[in-house]
Amino acid sequence: MTKINDKAKKGTVERRKRKDEKIKALLFDFGGTLAFLDYELLAREFSRDGRKLDALALEHAEYVGRQKIDDLLMAGEKDVVLAYGHFFRAWLEAAGIPAEEVVEHGERFGAIHREATLWRVVRPGTFEALERLKSAGYKLAIVSNAEGQVEADTKRFGLAPFFDVIIDSHIVGVAKPDPRIFHIALERLGVAPDEVRFAGDIFSIDILGARAAGIEARLIDQHSRYHWVDHHKIRHIEELHPLK
């Protein structure tokens, strides 16, 4: 029995290796995957109103917002912009902000975001991971639901040189989880769906969108909160190389 199990395991490894050898490109979400919310900045903003919220509490509460997006979209909601609005409400309430103050804070953060994105923290290991992937010969691309600023943000943060293609939903006119936004990226890269992998942090938007486009994906789950998701999860893009 042990020999049979070992043989089966070896066969699985070999099949995975052959599959990995086909991969020519890697696609990434932007916010929550390459750049993260500036929780320290947000905590300082709250302190101006006399509210003591530490950055770590805000970071952990954010999962509630992502879960709200998943609940809405997986229940059939089609309006992604509406879902993102519920994200902020659920997140801030989970962080301890009274419901009647959420709109006010949301407007303030929206103004900050429009001036200089709130997703502005590039975490340790990101540049090194992208350099390894680029040096290994992979084409790299970003596929992001955004407001037209992603290319400028990648330049500001020093990420732009790594990417061959940047797809911003505001510019191309279609947003995840619609598979068409992935098809645009594939066409510009000159690759097929089975030659690509994608990494993103919101299951209903990133993972289900990639699946609909025929692309295998990895869910970014830094704090192991997506326990209900039966899907390949990683904590950081560093885990993408070697491919798993």
What are these model-predicted stretches?
Residues T2-F30, E100-V103, F127, E131-K134, ...:
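Asp-based, Mg2+/Mn2+-dependent phosphohydrolase catalytic module
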